[in-house]
Amino acid sequence: MAIGPYLSIFTLNVNGFNVPTKRQRLAEWIQKQDPYICCLQETHLKTRDTYRLKVKGWKKIFHANRDQKKAGVAILISDKIDFKTKAMKRDKERHYITIKGSIQEDITITNIYAPNTGALQYVRQMLTSMKREINNNTIIVGDFNTPLTHMEISTKQKLTREHKL
């Protein structure tokens, strides 16, 4: 199926996906928003519980979960697009997943959940290791757990007059 001139992708840190009502509300939200691809971070699912990622109309589900209820990422692809999987890669800590495939042309999608401790170094290392594989059809999303500005690094910083809103 042709997808037109754009590809809608949503990314969301779900902060745990074990409560049935939360899964149901998220499934309804995904169906209402109707993106082609949905990337989730912090699924907190055990490997055996990945059936909980099911959403009606979304049969292609790629996940990286652990045997403990922490971390975890997933990429869900809508049945409305003809995604053909070529390869999948995930780390043993289940902090990222990369899928390579094609829709109308080759595409690579990486979904990252950086650990709270050492997040900046983790993201730098990830991007450095992926450097040779990144091209115009590479999409990298996720929760990088890094501050956007120096003001966000520490809540103990005093605000000067120019920084106050």
Regions inferred by a protein language model and the residue ranges of each:
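A shared catalytic/ligand-binding motif for oxyanion handling
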Residues: M1-L165
